[in-house]
């Protein structure tokens, strides 16, 4: 029953505010009326929602200062959003949490940079070794005795049948 009475009270206050605004502003076509009514409605809703919440929070919480601070910051941020500002009010706790998050991210990125730098150094060393192996060295006299294509040279006399097996022979094909 208390909730119903509270709801009726809330509706009657909103109706009273609207009636008061209509009586103050005679011109019904005034451009700012919806904005004023919206702001007053939001303020009244915040008032009705925050007071019971604050009472319950203060009774159940051990640290009432933090609860009040958090509620005030939330209310101020809500009003700033309604006014169209993108900035928000933050507490020291939130700033410290954001700083911790930023520091963790910076450490993670530094570790990644360190790993990448180590890999790049290893790749440069590998490329240097490959370059050193591929570099042409000048030789004064070339020893052809060690070439693999010079080992199995046969003369015509050394072949088994006495004729060159690589010479083309006459081939006949059926048509």
UniProtKB/Swiss-Prot annotation:
A cellular component annotation (GO) from this entry: host cell rough endoplasmic reticulum membrane
Domain of life the protein comes from: Viruses
Localization annotation: Host rough endoplasmic reticulum membrane; Host membrane, Host caveola; Secreted
Molecular function GO terms recorded: channel activity; metal ion binding; toxin activity
Membrane-spanning residues: 29-51
Pfam families, alphabetized: Rota_NSP4
Keywords: Activation of host autophagy by virus, Calcium, Enterotoxin, Glycoprotein, Host endoplasmic reticulum, Host membrane, Host-virus interaction, Ion channel, Ion transport, Membrane, Metal-binding, Secreted, Signal-anchor, Toxin, Transmembrane, Transmembrane helix, Transport, Viral ion channel, Virulence
Lumenal compartment spans: 1-28
UniProt: Ca(2+) binding residues: 120, 123
Modifications made to the protein after synthesis: The N-glycosyl content is primarily Man(9)GlcNAc, with a small amount of Man(8)GlcNAc.
One annotated GO biological process: monoatomic ion transmembrane transport
Positions annotated as glycosylated: 8, 18
Topology with respect to the bilayer: Single-pass type III membrane protein
Cytoplasmic topological segments: 52-175
InterPro entries recorded: Rotavirus_NSP4
Chief place where the protein resides: host cell
Annotated family: Belongs to the rotavirus NSP4 family.
Domain statement: Binds 1 calcium ion per tetramer.
Function: Plays an essential role in the virus replication cycle by acting as a viroporin. Creates a pore in the host endoplasmic reticulum and as a consequence releases Ca(2+) in the cytoplasm of infected cell. In turn, high levels of cytoplasmic calcium trigger membrane trafficking and transport of viral ER-associated proteins to viroplasms, sites of viral genome replication and immature particle assembly.
Subunit and interaction comment: Homotetramer. Interacts with the immature particle in the viroplasm. Interacts with host CAV1, early and late in infection. Interacts with host integrin ITGA1/ITGB1 heterodimer. Interacts with host integrin ITGA2/ITGB1 heterodimer. Interaction with microtubules blocks trafficking to the Golgi apparatus.
Protein's UniProt name: Non-structural glycoprotein 4
């Amino acid at each position: 029953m208390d909730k119903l009475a509270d709801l009726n009270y809330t509706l009657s206050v909103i109706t009273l505010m609207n009636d008061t605004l209509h009586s103050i502003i005679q011109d019904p076509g005034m451009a700012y009326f919806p904005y004023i009514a919206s702001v007053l409605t939001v303020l009244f809703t915040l008032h009705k929602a925050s007071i019971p919440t604050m009472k319950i929070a203060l009774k159940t919480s051990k640290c009432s200062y933090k609860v009040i601070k958090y509620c005030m910051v939330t209310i101020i941020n809500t009003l700033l959003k309604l006014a169209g500002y993108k900035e928000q009010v933050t507490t020291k706790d939130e700033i410290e949490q954001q700083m911790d998050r930023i520091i963790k991210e910076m450490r993670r990125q530094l570790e990644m940079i360190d790993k990448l730098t180590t890999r790049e150094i290893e790749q440069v060393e590998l490329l240097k070794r490959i370059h050193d192996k591929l570099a042409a060295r000048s030789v004064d006299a070339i020893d052809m005795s060690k070439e693999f294509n010079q080992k199995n040279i046969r003369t015509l006399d050394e072949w088994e049948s006495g004729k060159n097996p690589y010479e083309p022979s006459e081939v006949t094909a059926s048509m």
